[in-house]
């Protein structure tokens, strides 16, 4: 897979990715209640010749490659929205009292686009790419649910990558920020602080 070939092919499916993002934006679900989004993702994966497999309460996984030996690389997109009423004046606005305010519709559409490119070059892949479509990121439960359901096994994942769009940052459109190797995304976790003192 030559980078220039992938870039050309990505540009060729850009309008499809945009259309899918807008479709997903119109039917957001929250937490594990993402039925329309999940059905859309599974249909798109099946239509491109992949086999979507349920994982956990509302997640889905698909594999690309596996025809040649190599490591297993996981690509992840979150699918859930927030319980916010959308007030945007666009023709693809959500009407159901929920909203993709964090860009998860875009993440899902981008991973579907990546799946198309990977499927088109499946015979060139050393190893396997595991596609992870995750629910319930906003309530900090979706990834744990999928891991408990065996996400990281069969085949065992060697490395993973996720992306997140960042509106409002002081960078021009199209900028990609890559962090140092290792764990770099913030944890969606809880912690407790005890303060002792006179007061």
Residue ranges of model-derived segments:
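Acidic/His- and Gly-rich active-site-bordering loop/insert found
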Residues: 2-101, 105, 109-126
